[in-house]
Amino acid sequence: SLKELQTTYFDYYLWHNIGGDRAEEGLDAMGLFEERFVNNGMMDFLNKKKEEGVIRNLGFSYHGDVAVFDHALRLHDEGKVKFDFVLIELNYLDWKHAKEINDYNTNAEYLYGEVAKRGLMAFVMEPLLGGRLSNLPDKLVAQLKRRDPDHSVASWAFRYAGTPKNVLCVLSGMTYMEHLKDNLCTYSPLRPLTNEEARFLDEHISKQIVDYKTIPCNDCKYCMPCPYGIDIPGILVHYNKCLSADHVVKSKADPAYNDARRA
């Protein structure tokens, strides 16, 4: 890696994807962690490289089983490895509602709290939750625009992710130039959320998002091409738009049912 990057050291080097499993091989998340980082001597090797200055800051990225996240931090507490940062998923929906989205998830409030109380820095992924927080239902967009008409819906999520004291870096996947310009506007310089703005997102916007029974599709198109020629993301995105605009008939008791059925 050093040769490919034409350098003699890494500023930030991480253990990637702890918490995942290889169930098809009979390895649960903890077993895979031990196999990849402990039993093969990798942890000792990286500790040595950190002592030599080849690695300036060592961390890990967390995805999956929270027991492995806790275990990795215990290794840090016990002095078996010295971490400087952790890459976690953090956004205003996952802060308190991650488990409501997926029971396998862990609330970002807990993840960040465990990182911060040890004085470690947090790198943030999924600040927009795969684009979901930049494509909100029309009613929620209107509420955000009433409070701040001059900034994008996405900027609320990016400001939320960048506000906590121990957040060092927020990762952003950008597709278009306007995304880059919006991010630069948001972070140059960052205008931290006030406590009142954070509560507005945590207690008002987030709860409404959870109550919308949309299909969790981010139009990533990973499911395409469909062998049957169906535009899967196109259908799901259209359904979600109809749902967010209250254009989905809920039952035969709905006065608009007959009209919708004819359509």
Name the predicted role of every residue range.
Residues S1-V124, L128, L136-L140, D148-P149, ...:
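Glycine/proline-rich, positively charged
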Residues G79-K82, Y110-A263:
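Structured C-terminal cap/extension of enzyme domains
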